Regions:
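N-terminal FAD-binding dinucleotide-binding subdomain shared by FAD-dependent oxidases/monooxygenases
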Residues: 9-17, 42-43, 159, 200-214
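Flexible, glycine-rich phosphate/dinucleotide-binding loops
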Residues: 11, 112, 168
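C-terminal auxiliary extensions adjacent to catalytic cores
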Residues: 170-214
Length: 214
């Protein structure tokens, strides 16, 4: 038996309130694979044979994979005024520090306000999102150097392909935080192979410095 323990209020929340039909799609996937799940969960204790949740639920286990909350690097956490208590850097729409204008932060290092949930849920930062953030930050840095005014940044989207055994789930949302103009959730083996092809393409262009490619 497989049990999934999550701090999310529902499956497919992903820290962004869900996207389109992600809730239904994830619930269907779990039911089809006979995976039980525990929502709004907080772990109170772990023993070699058992995991106990704060609500008193005890889950027997022979093997467990536990993912602790993310936190920033020590350099940020130990530098007063640079990051928040978790070690992430607060930034504006151009990914410029809200207090120190010569500091920029993108991707996992920057802070995104979380959704309001019963149990805190972190906001994901995918590689695709990080590339978009970096481009916005680079344009803003160039504007700072040349003394020009930065253009309003575009909304960033989120694109994720989640592997699911012999298939995969393609998820897209624009902008990445609600309210969104467009969402798309599709499942199929084509999504798995699309992810494999993209990985080879992405590594090819990065290793050769061809970052101008889409």
């Amino acid at each position: 038996n497989i049990s999934f323990v999550t701090n999310e209020p529902f499956l497919g929340h992903f820290g962004v309130g869900g996207m389109g039909r992600t809730r239904r799609a994830m619930e269907d996937e779990f039911y089809e694979r006979d995976i039980s799940f525990h929502l709004n969960a907080e772990i109170a204790g772990i023993t070699p044979k058992e995991i106990e949740l704060k609500n008193g639920t005890k889950i027997g286990q022979d093997f467990a994979m536990i993912m602790p909350p993310f936190r920033g690097v020590d350099a940020v956490m130990n530098s007063q005024g640079i990051g928040n208590p978790k070690g992430f850097v607060p930034v504006d729409e151009h990914y410029k520090h809200k207090i120190y204008p010569n500091i920029y932060s993108v991707g996992v290092a920057m802070a995104i306000p979380p959704c309001n949930t019963p149990v805190p849920v972190g906001v994901p930062k995918t590689g695709d999102m990080t590339v978009q953030m970096a481009r916005i930050a680079a344009r803003s840095i160039a504007s700072d150097i040349t003394g020009q005014k930065s253009d309003p940044p575009p909304d960033i989207h989120v694109l994720c392909v989640a592997d699911a055994g012999d298939t995969a789930m393609f998820m897209y949302g624009s902008p990445f935080q609600a309210p969104r103009n467009r969402t798309l959730v599709k499942k199929g083996r084509w999504a798995h192979w699309a992810k494999v092809v993209f990985e080879h393409y992405f590594m090819y262009k990065i290793r050769r410095g061809m970052t101008y490619l889409p």
